[in-house]
């Protein structure tokens, strides 16, 4: 059985690091900080005239999905991933993205490669409806290999305080609606690379798998879906109680972040079609089911939590916005967490 830890990623150590960092960050908080470390986005209160608004910020990267871009020498879509990882996070609080900044660090500056990366970032910003206002490109010889780079982003969005989504009103019987992902998105690539032996044999990325209908490389470089515009449409008409972006940590880590302690989510596994890429990963790597749901999005990139009476309207809006979605579970009172059924 192959695990994420076998591939070099220690989730538990990551949790320990966050817990050590929390107290240091809290020492810097002023009275306008209204979320603790660990939320999808960081919320900062603004008083503007008679209204209260919240700035919601987030930062993220693309992870080792970049390795696939290096092997295929294709760099024009990873920027979309970078934007998606950031804007989808702040969307979990109902925030509309305002502006975005990027950070590119490389071993040797290649102007055409950087332009291709930023082309993707700009495309992602257009898809999210935000402005790309700046960034930093750092050339670091001897630190990165000449043909490699790292990519990260930072976004700021805004939401009226009374409309902010924070999960506090989630209750027993509320319904989880899963929004389709475009594929693996930007998490779990260290495990993917291990399962398919990509680092030892990058040529495997050119192999066309019948189950996928395209090459492995094409499948793995599909950009992360940006949910901003369809979900903001839902938020205009529906009281969405909680939103979870399914990223690192999969279902088990991210869904509980969208509701209070003392509740758990029951997920009906057969309620949506798991994309072929995840079945291949599980089969080739002999990865246990729980490990799959702890590492990957399994075809569900975002989860909305709504009251039962709002399900039909939510599904109708998502259909109008051309987003495939399914009712995938319910909220129950009890021990915190997620139960796969």
From Swiss-Prot:
Chief location category: cytoplasm
EC number per UniProt: 6.3.3.1
EC category name: ligase
Subcellular location: Cytoplasm
Upper taxonomic lineage: Bacteria, Bacillati, Bacillota, Bacillota incertae sedis, Caldicellulosiruptorales
Residue pairs linked by disulfide bridges in the UniProt entry: none
SUPFAM superfamilies documented for this protein: PurM C-terminal domain-like, PurM N-terminal domain-like
Keyword Secreted: no
HAMAP family documented for this protein: AIRS
GO biological process, one term: 'de novo' IMP biosynthetic process
Source organism: Caldicellulosiruptor bescii (strain ATCC BAA-1888 / DSM 6725 / KCTC 15123 / Z-1320)
Pathway membership, UniProt: Purine metabolism; IMP biosynthesis via de novo pathway; 5-amino-1-(5-phospho-D-ribosyl)imidazole from N(2)-formyl-N(1)-(5-phospho-D-ribosyl)glycinamide: step 2/2
Family that this chain belongs to: Belongs to the AIR synthase family.
Record field: catalytic activity: 2-formamido-N(1)-(5-O-phospho-beta-D-ribosyl)acetamidine + ATP = 5-amino-1-(5-phospho-beta-D-ribosyl)imidazole + ADP + phosphate + H(+)
One Pfam match: AIRS
GO cellular component: cytosol
Key words, A-Z: ATP-binding, Cytoplasm, Ligase, Nucleotide-binding, Purine biosynthesis
Protein name: Phosphoribosylformylglycinamidine cyclo-ligase
Gene Ontology MF terms: ATP binding; phosphoribosylamine-glycine ligase activity; phosphoribosylformylglycinamidine cyclo-ligase activity
């Amino acid at each position: 059985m192959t695990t994420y830890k076998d591939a070099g990623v220690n989730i538990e150590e990551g949790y320990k690091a966050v817990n050590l960092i929390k107290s240091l960050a809290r020492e810097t908080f002023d009275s306008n900080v209204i979320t603790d470390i660990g939320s999808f986005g960081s919320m900062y209160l603004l008083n503007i005239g008679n209204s209260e608004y919240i700035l919601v910020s987030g930062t993220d990267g693309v992870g080792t999905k970049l390795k696939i871009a290096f092997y295929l020498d294709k760099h024009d879509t990873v920027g979309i991933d970078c934007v998606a990882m950031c804007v989808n996070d702040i969307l979990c609080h109902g925030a509309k993205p305002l502006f975005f900044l990027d950070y590119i660090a490389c071993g040797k500056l290649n102007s055409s490669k950087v332009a291709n990366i930023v082309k993707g970032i700009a495309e992602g910003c257009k898809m999210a409806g935000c402005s790309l206002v700046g960034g930093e490109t750092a050339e670091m010889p001897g630190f990165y290999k000449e043909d490699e780079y790292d990519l990260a982003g930072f976004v700021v969005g805004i939401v009226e305080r009374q409309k902010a989504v924070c999960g506090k009103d989630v209750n027993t019987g509320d319904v989880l609606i899963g929004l389709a992902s475009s594929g693996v998105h930007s998490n779990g690539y260290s495990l993917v690379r291990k399962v398919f032996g990509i680092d030892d044999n990058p040529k495997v990325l050119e192999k066309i798998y019948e189950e996928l209908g395209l090459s492995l490389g094409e499948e793995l470089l599909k950009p992360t879906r940006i949910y901003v515009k369809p979900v903001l449409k839902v938020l205009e008409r529906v009281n969405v109680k909680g939103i979870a972006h399914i990223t690192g940590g999969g279902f088990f880590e991210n869904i509980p972040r969208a509701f209070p302690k003392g509740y758990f989510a029951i997920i009906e596994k057969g309620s949506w079609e798991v994309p072929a890429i995840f079945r291949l990963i599980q089969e080739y790597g002999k990865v246990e089911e729980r490990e799959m749901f702890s590492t990957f999005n399994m075809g569900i990139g975002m989860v909305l939590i709504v009251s039962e009476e709002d399900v039909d309207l939510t599904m109708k809006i998502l259909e109008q916005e051309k987003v495939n979605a399914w009712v995938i579970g319910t909220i129950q009172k009890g021990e915190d967490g997620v139960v796969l059924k």
